């Protein structure tokens, strides 16, 4: 057909000038892709996009040339055979997730050169041949998550130079082959989380110069060596949460631009002092829920760019080794979790680290004070927010110069007892001044009253004098009454001597003489 059209074009060009137009129109029609022959029953068609979802077909539809997109989600496909999609040469995306696919042959995606997005997630795939993705060099996104992959073929991703996103989450992968991503020069996002990785090879991620985000969380890694991530110059986020990491080391001296690192939920007990010097631009660090008891001063000095850190849930030893961390926290101006509790010794268990440092005077040393404002940081910091920032005086034991580093020796609290004495003196002075001020106010009121209302003052004074006299008279009368009652009850001696009778009243006594009685005879 092509040769016939070419012959007609040449004939018309030679015979008539109008043949040029016809030739061009024919070439244009030849370049247009063929339209699909028809929409399969029970499927949904949107132009050149076909959706055959949740229909339970056992194989892919045929004779659908010209399709740009095909979705076969939520079906019962169990196998992808060689050449199964041969007639779909115009296809740009293919969704095969949520099926029962357990076997994929090496030539299953033959002639799908234009496919940019392939989704195979939520199936039962156990392995993929080396040649699986070879017919699709234009792939940008591949999703293999939630399958049963146990191993990756060494050349599985060979030739995928345009791949930018790769998902392999929630499989059973135990090892990442060396240089498996060597050709993935455009890869920016890689997720291998929720697998069974126990170790990493030094060159497992070689060639990923544009990688910005790497997920390795929920694996079985027991050691993290920053040398396993060489020359990842564009990496900004590294997630290693919920592994079994016990130590963090760096056996390769090089600098990378990492800005966010998540090491939470591990079993970290030791970190090399120089390990964070290779990431000078680190801004966010999660170290919560580990087994750290203290942090080396050299590590603290390397955290110069941090704006957020989590340290809760560790086994902090609130002895002398915690002083460097307490001093660093008191001067940290970023965000950190405030729930740092002491795990030892016994007398400090359950106490907040900074509160324990202040309450138990753990870091007092008058010789080399390294933080003059730790007291204010402890008393003024919020529970969940960052501590109060203040100017800090740093002492260098070697040369006596201030270079902005924390020495491992001690953290002094020079304001401890002196601050308490100053507070007491301040209270005494304030109370004395208040009394003097009150006395002066009373004197001022009396003076103003004496000047403005002299008659009222004289009447008031007379009332005071009169009231005082009445009180004295009442006191005298009560005393006399008490004396009379005492004589009546105490000195009275009953006798039958006829004589004078004494009558006592309130104002004095009267004497009455009684004459003896006489008997008369009748």
Swiss-Prot record:
<feature type="glycosylation site" description="N-linked (GlcNAc...) asparagine">
    <location>
        <position position="130"/>
    </location>
</feature>
<feature type="repeat" description="LRR 4">
    <location>
        <begin position="137"/>
        <end position="159"/>
    </location>
</feature>
<feature type="repeat" description="LRR 2">
    <location>
        <begin position="89"/>
        <end position="111"/>
    </location>
</feature>
<feature type="topological domain" description="Extracellular">
    <location>
        <begin position="35"/>
        <end position="427"/>
    </location>
</feature>
<feature type="repeat" description="LRR 10">
    <location>
        <begin position="279"/>
        <end position="302"/>
    </location>
</feature>
<feature type="repeat" description="LRR 3">
    <location>
        <begin position="112"/>
        <end position="135"/>
    </location>
</feature>
<dbReference type="GO" id="GO:0002224">
    <property type="term" value="P:toll-like receptor signaling pathway"/>
</dbReference>
<feature type="repeat" description="LRR 5">
    <location>
        <begin position="161"/>
        <end position="183"/>
    </location>
</feature>
<feature type="glycosylation site" description="N-linked (GlcNAc...) asparagine">
    <location>
        <position position="63"/>
    </location>
</feature>
<feature type="repeat" description="LRR 6">
    <location>
        <begin position="184"/>
        <end position="207"/>
    </location>
</feature>
<comment type="similarity">
    <text>Belongs to the LRRTM family.</text>
</comment>
<keyword id="KW-1133">Transmembrane helix</keyword>
<dbReference type="Pfam" id="PF13855">
    <property type="entry name" value="LRR_8"/>
</dbReference>
<feature type="region of interest" description="Disordered">
    <location>
        <begin position="382"/>
        <end position="401"/>
    </location>
</feature>
<dbReference type="GO" id="GO:0038023">
    <property type="term" value="F:signaling receptor activity"/>
</dbReference>
<dbReference type="InterPro" id="IPR003591">
    <property type="entry name" value="Leu-rich_rpt_typical-subtyp"/>
</dbReference>
<feature type="transmembrane region" description="Helical">
    <location>
        <begin position="428"/>
        <end position="448"/>
    </location>
</feature>
<feature type="domain" description="LRRNT">
    <location>
        <begin position="35"/>
        <end position="63"/>
    </location>
</feature>
<feature type="repeat" description="LRR 1">
    <location>
        <begin position="64"/>
        <end position="87"/>
    </location>
</feature>
<feature type="topological domain" description="Cytoplasmic">
    <location>
        <begin position="449"/>
        <end position="522"/>
    </location>
</feature>
<feature type="repeat" description="LRR 8">
    <location>
        <begin position="233"/>
        <end position="255"/>
    </location>
</feature>
<dbReference type="InterPro" id="IPR032675">
    <property type="entry name" value="LRR_dom_sf"/>
</dbReference>
<keyword id="KW-0812">Transmembrane</keyword>
<keyword id="KW-0472">Membrane</keyword>
<feature type="repeat" description="LRR 7">
    <location>
        <begin position="209"/>
        <end position="231"/>
    </location>
</feature>
<dbReference type="GO" id="GO:0006954">
    <property type="term" value="P:inflammatory response"/>
</dbReference>
<keyword id="KW-0677">Repeat</keyword>
<feature type="domain" description="LRRCT">
    <location>
        <begin position="314"/>
        <end position="365"/>
    </location>
</feature>
<keyword id="KW-0628">Postsynaptic cell membrane</keyword>
<dbReference type="InterPro" id="IPR001611">
    <property type="entry name" value="Leu-rich_rpt"/>
</dbReference>
<feature type="glycosylation site" description="N-linked (GlcNAc...) asparagine">
    <location>
        <position position="380"/>
    </location>
</feature>
<keyword id="KW-0433">Leucine-rich repeat</keyword>
<keyword id="KW-0732">Signal</keyword>
<keyword id="KW-0770">Synapse</keyword>
<dbReference type="GO" id="GO:0045211">
    <property type="term" value="C:postsynaptic membrane"/>
</dbReference>
<feature type="repeat" description="LRR 9">
    <location>
        <begin position="256"/>
        <end position="278"/>
    </location>
</feature>
<keyword id="KW-0325">Glycoprotein</keyword>
<keyword id="KW-1003">Cell membrane</keyword>
<feature type="signal peptide">
    <location>
        <begin position="1"/>
        <end position="34"/>
    </location>
</feature>
<comment type="function">
    <text>Exhibits strong synaptogenic activity, restricted to excitatory presynaptic differentiation, acting at both pre- and postsynaptic level.</text>
</comment>
<protein>
    <recommendedName>
        <fullName>Leucine-rich repeat transmembrane neuronal protein 1</fullName>
    </recommendedName>
</protein>
């Amino acid at each position: 057909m092509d040769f016939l059209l070419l012959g007609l074009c040449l004939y018309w060009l030679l015979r008539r000038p109008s043949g040029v137009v016809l030739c061009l129109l024919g070439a244009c029609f030849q370049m247009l892709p063929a339209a699909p022959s028809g929409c399969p029953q029970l499927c949904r068609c949107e132009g050149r996009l076909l959706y055959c979802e949740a229909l339970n077909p056992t194989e892919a539809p045929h004779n659908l040339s010209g399709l740009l997109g095909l979705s076969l989600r939520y079906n019962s496909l169990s196998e992808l055979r060689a050449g199964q999609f041969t007639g779909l040469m115009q296809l740009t995306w293919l969704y095969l997730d949520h099926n029962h696919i357990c076997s994929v042959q090496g030539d299953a995606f033959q002639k799908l050169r234009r496919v940019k997005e392939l989704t195979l997630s939520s199936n039962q795939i156990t392995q993929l041949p080396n040649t699986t993705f070879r017919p699709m060099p234009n792939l940008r996104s591949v999703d293999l998550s939630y399958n049963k992959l146990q191993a990756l073929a060494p050349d599985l991703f060979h030739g995928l130079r345009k791949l930018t996103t790769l998902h392999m989450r929630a499989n059973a992968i135990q090892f990442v082959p060396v240089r498996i991503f060597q050709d993935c020069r455009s890869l920016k996002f890689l997720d291998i989380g929720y697998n069974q990785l126990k170790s990493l090879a030094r060159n497992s991620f070689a060639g990923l110069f544009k990688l910005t985000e790497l997920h390795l969380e929920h694996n079985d890694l027991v050691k993290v060596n920053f040398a396993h991530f060489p020359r990842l110059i564009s990496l900004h986020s590294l997630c290693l949460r919920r592994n079994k990491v016990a130590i963090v080391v760096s056996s390769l001296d090089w600098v990378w631009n990492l800005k966010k690192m998540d090491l939470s939920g591990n079993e970290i007990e030791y970190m090399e002092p120089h390990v964070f010097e290779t990431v000078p631009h680190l801004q966010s660090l999660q170290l919560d829920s580990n087994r750290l008891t203290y942090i080396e001063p050299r590590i603290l000095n390397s955290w110069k760019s941090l704006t957020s850190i989590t340290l809760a849930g560790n086994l902090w030893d609130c002895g002398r080794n915690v002083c460097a961390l307490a001093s660093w926290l008191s001067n940290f101006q970023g965000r950190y979790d405030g729930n740092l509790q002491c795990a030892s010794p016994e007398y400090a268990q359950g106490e907040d680290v900074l509160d324990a440092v202040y309450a138990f005077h753990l870091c007092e040393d008058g010789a080399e004070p390294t933080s003059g404002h730790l007291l204010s940081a402890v008393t003024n910091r919020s529970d969940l927010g960052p501590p109060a920032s203040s100017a800090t005086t740093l002492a260098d034991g070697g040369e006596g110069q201030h270079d902005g580093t924390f020495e491992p020796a001690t953290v002094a609290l020079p304001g401890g007892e002196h601050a308490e004495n100053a507070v007491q003196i301040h209270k005494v002075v304030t109370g004395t001044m208040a009394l003097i001020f009150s006395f002066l106010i009373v004197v001022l009121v009396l003076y103003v009253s004496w000047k403005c209302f002299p008659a009222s003052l004289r009447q008031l004074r007379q009332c005071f004098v009169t009231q005082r006299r009445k009180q004295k008279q009442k006191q005298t009368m009560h005393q006399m009454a008490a004396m009379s009652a005492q004589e009546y009850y105490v000195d009275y001696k009953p006798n039958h001597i006829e004589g004078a009778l004494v009558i006592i009243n309130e104002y004095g006594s009267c004497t009455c003489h009684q004459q003896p009685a006489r008997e008369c005879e009748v």
